[in-house]
């Protein structure tokens, strides 16, 4: 006795000999029930009798599906001929035709039935309920896409979700992911392992593509991480600049200390070396003279003595001292000329002299002009005297020639 939503089902008769179906189920024949006293929505579920010699069957007047649609089992006979009846799905529609066409449904999944009118969309097709019940498969199972055609393209919802995941910084499929590298000591690089929230494949690729063994990959997700890395690099560069400035200042202090301490000590050591060299040379001269006292000079020593005598005479020559004084005077004039500023030199080159600032030069020029004036006066006086003498002689000579 079966109940469906509170209604009493129809009674089932005992099976007779030879009344088994194709898959071994017992096909029972139920009496025709009146309208409204059957299945879930008021219809009576009846099975077509099988195994009889004539293959006769009885059908209910209103069908046996959940929504009142007719569901029939194939009728078999001893001649192994099978007549396919239209199969109905859970929602009362024929599995072979969803568009209104009455097509036959193959019994097994590898059997194919050609539809001359319109291809059936088998992507989401459900397996017939009778076949699932006989094979032990759940009626809610769907046919795989590999058996009934290629997979359908992703839906709009899946595409939108994929785009959302690509922009979500906390999702593993985020598109804004980039591995950077941090430099660490070589002995510590092997101690770094993959963090728990990193992708193993991407981590292995980053480790394989690192430029050297002294760097480790670091994942940056999105623009905030890139900005953090830029700020850290700027901070590190500023730290390096501060350190470089400290190094330059330290080098400056060491250089000043070297110039003040070691340079002075080096100059003192050089002077001491020169004094010691002179003392050693004088000592060597005295030792050599004492060793060869009373001995005749050798030819080379005699030549050296003559050269030394000549040098002594040249040093004591007064002409040399006069020449030295002249050279010293020229050097003094050169030094004095260097003391004149560049402006004064340019003014002198242009002929412009600031007499208020160059009183010494004015006195020098005055003295030179005075000397020139005296010289010119003397020349004029000589010329006048010579002219008077010439005129006198000419005067005396002309009368004598006339006489």
Swiss-Prot record:
GO terms for biological process: NLS-bearing protein import into nucleus; nuclear pore organization; protein localization to nuclear inner membrane; ribosomal subunit export from nucleus. Residues 1-31, 67-124 have a biased composition (Polar residues). One of its GO terms (molecular function) is structural constituent of nuclear pore. InterPro entries: Nup54/Nup57/Nup44, Nup54_alpha-helical_dom. Keywords: Cytoplasm, Nucleus, Transport. Pfam families: Nup54 (PF13874). Residues 1-124 are annotated as: Disordered. PANTHER family: NUCLEOPORIN P54 (PTHR13000:SF0). This is Nucleoporin nup44. The gene is nup44.
């Amino acid at each position: 006795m079966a109940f469906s939503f509170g209604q009493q089902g129809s009674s089932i008769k005992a099976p007779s000999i030879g009344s088994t179906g194709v898959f071994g189920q017992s096909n029972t024949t139920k009496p025709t029930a009146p309208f409204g006293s059957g299945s879930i929505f008021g219809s009576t579920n009846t099975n077509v009798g099988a195994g009889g010699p004539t293959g006769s069957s009885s059908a209910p007047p209103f069908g046996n599906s959940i929504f009142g649609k007719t569901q029939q089992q194939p009728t078999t006979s001893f001649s192994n001929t099978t007549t396919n009846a239209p199969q109905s799905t859970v929602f009362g529609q024929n599995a072979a035709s969803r568009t209104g066409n009455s097509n036959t449904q193959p019994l097994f999944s590898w059997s194919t039935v050609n539809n001359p009118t319109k291809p059936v969309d088998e992507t989401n097709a459900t397996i017939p309920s009778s076949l699932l019940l006989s094979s032990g498969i759940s009626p809610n199972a769907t046919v795989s896409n590999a058996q009934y055609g290629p997979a359908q393209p992703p839906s709009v919802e899946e595409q939108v979700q994929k785009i959302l995941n690509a922009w979500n910084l906390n999702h593993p499929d985020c598109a804004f992911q980039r591995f950077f590298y941090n430099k660490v000591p070589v002995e510590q690089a092997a101690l770094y392992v993959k963090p728990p929230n990193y992708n193993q494949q991407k981590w292995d690729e980053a480790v394989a593509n690192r430029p050297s063994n002294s760097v480790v990959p670091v994942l940056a997700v999105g623009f905030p991480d890139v900005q953090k890395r830029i700020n850290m690099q700027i901070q590190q560069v500023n730290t390096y600049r501060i350190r470089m400035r400290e190094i330059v200042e330290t080098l400056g202090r060491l250089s000043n200390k070297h110039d003040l301490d070691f340079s002075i000590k080096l100059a003192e050591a050089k002077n001491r070396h020169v004094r010691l060299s002179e003392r050693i040379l004088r000592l060597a001269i005295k030792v050599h003279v004492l060793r060869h006292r009373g001995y005749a000079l050798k030819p080379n020593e005699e030549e050296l003595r003559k050269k030394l005598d000549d040098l002594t005479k040249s040093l004591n020559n007064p002409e040399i001292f006069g020449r030295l004084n002249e050279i010293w005077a020229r050097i003094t004039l050169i030094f004095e000329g260097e003391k004149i500023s560049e402006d004064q030199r340019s003014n002198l080159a242009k002929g412009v002299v600031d007499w208020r600032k160059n009183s010494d030069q004015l006195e020098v020029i005055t003295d030179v002009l005075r000397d020139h004036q005296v010289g010119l006066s003397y020349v004029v006086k000589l010329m006048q005297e010579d002219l008077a003498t010439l005129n006198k002689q000419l005067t005396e000579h002309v009368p004598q020639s006339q006489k």
